[in-house]
């Protein structure tokens, strides 16, 4: 399975602190995928000589095919190479200036691994940029969503899922309804480049996901909570991560301006296919045994052959942004 990771930077933080963690997470995420890698840099901390964040630019029609594209509010870089070959020091200045960033390391389950259009982050629809770890039933998603999903450019289930989410932009409960329609394994992160002050992170069935904060108030997420412990050990405890496993069926809306914080939580019913838990053993790559056992003990997903509980999406916590 793929690896996802990201950060939202505290405004008063030394930019290199969170940037170093982000790059280190990318290297650790190679444990979960080496077929392709990429990252998106979101917003701007407005360095000296600049006023405010860049405005969103319309995504070019071929954005999903490009190895690098500047969308104004978001810059996307990706390649069909592992993270260690993709990342270069020339990206450090832009990363230090970004308010948020998220990355992806691909272990291909659907779609040609050697084709750039299938590498993430994916730029889709009217301006959604996202990454996905998992394997979902794309045909069922197209069939079950009444509003329909536009045609895909590539061959991945991730693109279909992100196109479905693009249709619910700006509607938190509507987004949870889309996630509840998903059948299969999923953990993902995305932004609406027209409203980059919020980053969305969600966990569906099975695929692990954790969020963490460090001693300077930076907020992170990653496929494995184990990675945060490794990095803290390497730093001699200086990073001081506080780590939380994200439960199945949870969408988090994270403020990417001001002080990073989870502004809203929305729950939905996660659904897996029969056998998903043993068909994809790589979902636990990079996760130590203690964390695997904890995730498994907390599992709450429904198997597709069983009846839905009928509760629908539920906004369980909300706070004003800004």
Describe the predicted segments one by one.
Residues 1-322:
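Conserved short alpha-helical segments that host acidic/polar catalytic motifs at enzyme active sites
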């Amino acid at each position: 399975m793929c690896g996802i990771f990201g950060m939202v930077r505290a405004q008063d933080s030394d930019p290199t602190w969170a940037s170093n963690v982000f790059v280190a997470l990318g290297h650790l995420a190679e444990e979960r995928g080496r077929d392709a890698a990429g990252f998106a840099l979101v917003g701007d901390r407005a360095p000296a000589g600049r006023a405010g964040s860049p405005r969103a630019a319309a995504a070019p029609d071929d954005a999903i095919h490009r190895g690098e594209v500047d969308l104004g509010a978001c810059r996307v870089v990706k390649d069909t190479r592992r993270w260690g070959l993709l990342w270069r020091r020339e990206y450090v200045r832009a990363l230090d200036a970004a308010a948020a960033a998220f990355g992806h390391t691909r272990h291909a389950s659907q779609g040609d691994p050697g084709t750039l259009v299938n590498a993430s982050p994916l730029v889709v629809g009217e301006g959604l940029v996202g990454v996905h770890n998992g394997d979902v039933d794309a045909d069922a998603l197209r069939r079950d969503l009444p509003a329909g999903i536009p045609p895909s450019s590539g061959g991945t289930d991730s693109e279909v899922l992100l196109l479905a989410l693009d249709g619910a932009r700006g509607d938190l409960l509507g987004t949870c309804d889309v996630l509840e329609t998903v059948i299969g394994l999923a953990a993902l992160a995305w932004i609406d480049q027209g409203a980059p002050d919020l980053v969305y992170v969600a966990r569906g069935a099975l695929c692990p996901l954790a969020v963490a904060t460090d001693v300077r108030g930076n907020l992170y997420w990653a496929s494995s909570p184990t990675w945060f412990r490794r990095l803290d050990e390497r730093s001699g405890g200086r990073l001081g991560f506080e780590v939380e496993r994200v439960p199945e069926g949870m969408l988090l809306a994270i403020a990417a301006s001001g002080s990073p914080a989870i502004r809203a939580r929305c729950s939905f019913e996660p659904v897996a296919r029969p056998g998903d838990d043993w068909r994809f053993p790589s979902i636990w790559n990079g996760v130590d045994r203690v964390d695997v056992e904890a995730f498994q003990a907390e599992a709450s997903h429904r198997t597709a052959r069983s009846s839905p509980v009928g509760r629908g999406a539920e906004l369980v916590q909300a706070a004003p942004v800004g």
